[in-house]
């Protein structure tokens, strides 16, 4: 059934479809397209059945959601001094935000008679009804208003605004709901449009096969002007002749949408145009390559959306693309920005040179680097190197911890295959990706980056656990160590101390021939390492950190590859456990000293209570030295070194246990297959940013790990989940756990221990303080202090004397119900007035100034007392004489 217009008003077809014709959106658009392309725009009056579906619309709930941000004030200016009927529109943005009621008051240029408190449903409905408008529009009056508009266009500054997040259509409306068109309709750029009287929408020129639907919900009518697509080129040619068209700078000046012309100008230049008035509850549909403009007769509210026309009705004309910064289309977001037809597109694509393709590949490769994980890029690298495709197939970093649900929970608890991924931050994760794939170098000044080549992993050097002497070779004797390692890795058997070892294998199946060849070198340098000064850096260099050229003897220690400090530092910050409180750290049972003691200035202190590190270090005068061991070393200690022994991964700063590295209970390592060669030198200093002091107890994981750099600061809390520090996965003394077992430093109600300077060594009852909760306050319980100190039902801390500093725990000034933990941190609540504060300082000040009867501040003149100091200043600044001055004045008068 063919759909025809019921009438044509000033060249614009007007359709009044039946409900059956109107119900099929796609069919109706296909039928009226031929009329729209010929005339530019059409007017559609919906049937009464559809209007009945809008009964009671718009609802008050939808009107409340409308928020008009940064409306635009328009100013029309003539192109030249002559009255030629061509105007340019300048926009000025307002930084204010309005709701619908405030916007109507602004539109009427009246005082804000409706306050924010009157923003209720009744007020909204009254301001959105058409019969509440003061003017009743008829054709005769509209002609007078149109003539008045063009006479005063240069003297008015109307506002208009756009809301792209709201819609007034009922959500359950399925027919012609611009907020919910059928999925088969490719639509975009839906928005609410509202404007004041004489608000202007300049000449628009839509792209090929793009249409727009405009619906007027309520308010004053709109005046529309349109130029059919057949006359668009003529109109653009005439406008380009105007001196102010700025065609020399931008041939597509019409795309700026800042030009409007009067009907007299169009008649004078013999340009065919159409005109129509849009009333409320009517649709205006524009078609491709036609031009349209208009203005508002008063305050109104409409909604519009763009959609793609059927390809069979495409107009084979495409407007020019604007390339300057004033192009308005570039600021629009939608799926149709690249769907326009260009006749020269195939020729332009055919003229692309090979150099352009190479440049595109380079940009694409770098874009992939920034938008893909290091695992994906490493897989690409493995595929490019088939010789090493079978090496390290079970990559531990393949299970990324970036998701909220970790992969392989059992494996994570066993600390076998999980590595520290990129929990720190997205920025540090990208830094880690760059450090894994791109190696910065200073050798070639012409290129800032160079690709890395995978090198096979060299065997690790392992020290047998039954060795009697332990030490660390200094960097001055590393060349001999490197030569021994090279000989060990290349020869199946090695002669040590005049005897030949044929692939010696210990009970664990680990080849110890390399360790045996190194044992003498370590023993010879052990005493010198223990007695060295702080100027001698003591470290161990694993074989995986040595470059192939160094191992082959072509270059000494620190060859061409020690310039990659930037990549190492960035990856270290991204993977270091000390850089994020949420990451697991090395276990409390540090291999530094397994005896469970820590030495401070020669004083041994037992930390078996769980609050200190189970490991031990010896510190003398601030200089760290290797702990000298006696006849035999424990079985769980392989290397004793004051500095952390590097793992085979050069990007890790954790201690390694060479006896059983897979089941040692250490913290997960950062990507263990990284192949960045790095040699540690005396004159190289790496930056380590630690947030150990700010470790949040809420973000603590299953295990309590500590960085090897923070052994001197024992943990003041114990995990409340499980304790795996003993390697068994079973918490000791689990029957003594109580809800307050976290300790004072763990609880958010306690502050950090206060440091008291001086040599005050006086402590109460063996430096133990016990606290019990009574209501909302923490009070010291003398009876508990005199009882057994092993009572686990109360808080207990210890005071440590270290270099004259006493660490003493003290109670918080806030009650338990005054501090609430939320997702954003602590919230302090005043229990008297229920006000919330972001810090304890504000809560304390609020209590003193509002709820406290104390008045500590007094006026220096009259002695009047006030609660706050600023109240005294306000009192003094007032030109009111003080009490004492008034008394002196009365005495003088008498």
Swiss-Prot record:
Location of the protein in the cell: Nucleus
Record-listed Phosphoserine modification sites: 70, 343, 690, 694, 696, 734, 747
GO cellular component, one term: mitochondrion
Entry GO MF terms: DNA-binding transcription repressor activity, RNA polymerase II-specific; histone H3K36 demethylase activity; histone H3K9 demethylase activity; RNA polymerase II cis-regulatory region sequence-specific DNA binding; zinc ion binding
Induction (record text): Induced upon nutrient starvation.
Domain JmjC, chain residue ranges per copy: 170-324
Comp. bias regions, Polar residues: 335-354, 769-785, 795-810
Coiled coil region boundaries: 90-110, 361-385
Listed InterPro entries: JmjC_dom (IPR003347), JmjN (IPR003349), Znf_C2H2_sf (IPR036236), Znf_C2H2_type (IPR013087)
Record field: compositional bias (Low complexity): 521-554, 756-768
Domain JmjN: 12-53
PROSITE patterns, per database record: JMJC, JMJN, ZINC_FINGER_C2H2_1, ZINC_FINGER_C2H2_2
Pfam family, one: JmjN
Organism superkingdom: Eukaryota
Region (Disordered): 324-355, 521-558, 756-810
A GO biological-process term: negative regulation of transcription by RNA polymerase II
C2H2-type Zn finger ranges: 828-851, 857-882
Motif segment (Bipartite nuclear localization signal): 316-332
Keywords, ordered alphabetically: Activator, Coiled coil, DNA-binding, Metal-binding, Nucleus, Phosphoprotein, Repeat, Repressor, Transcription, Transcription regulation, Zinc, Zinc-finger
Extra remark beyond the main annotation: Present with 432 molecules/cell in log phase SD medium.
Function: Transcription factor involved in the regulation of gene expression upon nutrient starvation. Recognizes and binds to the post-diauxic-shift element 5'-T[AT]AGGGAT-3' in the promoter region. Can act as a transcriptional activator (e.g. of stress genes like SSA3, HSP12 and HSP26) as well as a repressor (e.g. of pyrophosphate phosphatase DPP1). GIS1 also acts as a DNA damage-responsive transcriptional repressor of photolyase PHR1.
UniProt-recorded name of the protein: Transcriptional activator/repressor GIS1
Organism whose genome encodes this protein: Saccharomyces cerevisiae (strain ATCC 204508 / S288c)
Gene that encodes the chain: GIS1
């Amino acid at each position: 059934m063919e759909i025809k217009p019921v009438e044509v008003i000033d060249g614009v077809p007007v359709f009044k479809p039946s409900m059956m014709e109107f119900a099929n959106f796609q069919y109706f658009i296909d039928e009226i397209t031929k009329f729209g392309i010929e005339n530019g725009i059409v007017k559609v009056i919906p049937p009464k059945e559809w209007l009945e579906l809008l009964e009671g619309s718009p609802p008050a709930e939808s009107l409340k959601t409308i928020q008009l941000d940064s409306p635009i004030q328009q100013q029309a200016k003539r192109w030249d001094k002559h009255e030629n009927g061509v105007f340019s529109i300048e926009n000025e943005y307002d930084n204010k935000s309005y709701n619908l009621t405030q916007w109507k008051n602004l539109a009427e240029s009246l005082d804000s008679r409706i306050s924010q408190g009157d923003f209720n449903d009744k007020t909204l409905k009254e301001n959105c009804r058409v019969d509440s408008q003061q003017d009743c529009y008829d054709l005769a009056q509209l002609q007078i208003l149109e003539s008045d508009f063009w006479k005063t266009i240069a003297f008015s500054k109307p506002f208009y605004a756009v809301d792209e997040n709201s819609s007034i259509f009922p959500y359950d409306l399925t027919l012609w709901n611009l907020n919910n068109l059928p999925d088969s309709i490719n639509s975009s750029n839906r928005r609410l449009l509202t404007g004041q009287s004489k608000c202007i929408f300049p000449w628009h020129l839509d792209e090929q096969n793009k249409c727009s639907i405009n619906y007027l919900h309520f308010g004053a009518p709109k005046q529309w002007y349109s130029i059919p697509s057949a006359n668009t080129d003529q109109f653009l040619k005439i406008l380009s002749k105007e001196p102010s068209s700025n065609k020399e700078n931008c041939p597509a000046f019409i795309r700026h949408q800042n030009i409007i012309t009067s009907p007299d100008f169009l008649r004078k230049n013999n340009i065919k145009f159409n005109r129509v008035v849009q009333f409320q509850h009517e649709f205006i549909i524009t078609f491709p390559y036609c031009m349209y403009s208009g203005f508002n007769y008063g305050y109104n509210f409409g909604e519009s959306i763009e959609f793609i026309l059927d390809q069979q009705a495409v107009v084979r004309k495409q407007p020019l693309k604007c390339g300057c910064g004033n192009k308005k289309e570039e600021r629009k977001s939608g799926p149709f920005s690249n769907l326009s037809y260009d006749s020269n597109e195939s020729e332009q694509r055919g003229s692309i040179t090979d150099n352009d393709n190479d440049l595109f590949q380079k940009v694409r490769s770098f874009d992939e680097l920034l938008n893909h994980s290091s695992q994906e890029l490493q897989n690409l690298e493995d595929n490019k190197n088939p010789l090493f495709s079978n090496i390290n197939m079970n990559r531990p970093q393949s299970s990324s911890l970036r998701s909220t649900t970790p992969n392989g929970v059992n494996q994570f608890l066993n600390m076998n295959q999980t590595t520290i991924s990129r929990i720190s931050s997205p920025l540090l994760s990208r830094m880690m990706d760059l450090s894994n794939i791109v190696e910065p170098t200073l050798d070639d000044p012409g290129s800032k980056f160079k690709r890395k080549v995978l090198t096979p992993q060299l065997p690790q050097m392992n020290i047998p656990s039954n060795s009697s002497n332990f030490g660390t070779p200094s960097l001055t004797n590393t060349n001999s160590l490197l030569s021994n390692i090279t000989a060990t890795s290349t020869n199946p058997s090695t002669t040590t101390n005049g005897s030949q070892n044929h692939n010696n294998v210990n009970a664990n199946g680990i080849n110890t021939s390399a360790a045996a060849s190194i044992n003498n070198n370590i023993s010879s340098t052990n005493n010198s390492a223990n007695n060295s000064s702080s100027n001698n850096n003591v470290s161990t260099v694993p074989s995986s950190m040595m470059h192939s050229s160094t191992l082959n003897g072509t270059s000494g220690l620190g060859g061409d590859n020690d310039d990659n400090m930037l990549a190492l530092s960035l990856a270290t910050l991204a993977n270091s456990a000390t850089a994020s409180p949420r990451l697991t750290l090395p276990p409390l049972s540090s291999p530094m000293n397994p005896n469970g003691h820590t030495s401070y200035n020669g004083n041994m202190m037992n930390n078996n209570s769980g609050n200190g590190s189970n490991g031990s270090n010896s510190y003398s005068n601030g200089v760290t030295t290797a702990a000298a061991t006696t006849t035999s070393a424990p079985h769980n200690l392989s290397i004793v070194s004051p500095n952390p022994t590097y793992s085979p991964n050069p990007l890790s700063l954790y201690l390694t246990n060479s006896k059983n590295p897979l089941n040692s209970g250490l913290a997960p390592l950062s990507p263990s297959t990284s192949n960045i060669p790095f040699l540690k030198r005396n004159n190289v200093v790496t930056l380590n940013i630690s947030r150990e002091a700010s470790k949040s107890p809420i973000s603590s994981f299953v295990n309590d790990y500590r960085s090897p750099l923070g052994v001197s600061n024992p943990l003041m809390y114990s995990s409340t989940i499980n304790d795996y520090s003993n390697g068994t996965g079973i918490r000791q003394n689990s029957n003594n756990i109580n809800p307050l077992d976290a300790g004072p430093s763990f609880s958010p109600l306690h502050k950090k221990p206060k440091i008291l300077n001086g040599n005050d060594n006086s402590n109460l009852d063996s430096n133990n303080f016990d606290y019990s909760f009574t209501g909302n306050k923490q009070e010291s319980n003398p009876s508990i202090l005199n009882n057994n100190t092993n009572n686990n039902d109360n808080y207990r801390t210890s005071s440590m004397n270290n270099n004259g500093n006493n660490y003493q725990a003290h109670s918080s000034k806030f009650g338990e119900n005054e501090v609430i933990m939320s997702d954003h941190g602590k919230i302090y609540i005043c229990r008297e007035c229920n006000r919330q504060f972001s810090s304890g300082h504000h809560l304390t000040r609020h209590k003193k100034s509002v709820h406290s009867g104390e008045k500590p501040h007094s006026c220096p003149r009259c002695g009047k007392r006030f609660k706050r100091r600023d109240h005294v200043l306000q009192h003094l600044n007032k030109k009111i004489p003080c009490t004492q001055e008034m008394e002196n004045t009365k005495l003088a008068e008498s």
